């Protein structure tokens, strides 16, 4: 998993991929939470397989992608059709595919500016909360972390009580 969906930490996928590769292990990573929030380079990550989910970057629900490094051997999920390079039989959902492609492109526009703004807001919120309540704990490292994510624990306050207070 490139980025954790709950606490937002970014994992060292390239280093993990290097270890797997040195032992002849095919590595897959789930990049669903990261795409649209980070610039991802499949070659740089070094994974043989990378999965994405369109709805995570404001695309349509029900469509995803599996990025497959050239030379990686896969077995078909279903026999009988030539779709998806012989890996899956059935009619391709063209409107979903087009929607995913458009969302993927849009999610990369102004990415650096958007992420810098979100990171500044996140860091300002974190500093303000710490100043008001020094017992608040950050779950996971502050860096590297997705810019839009701040996962906290407030000691001695139940999740339901905190939720009610934030309503």
Model-identified regions with their sequence ranges:
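Pyridoxal 5′-phosphate
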Residues: 1-167
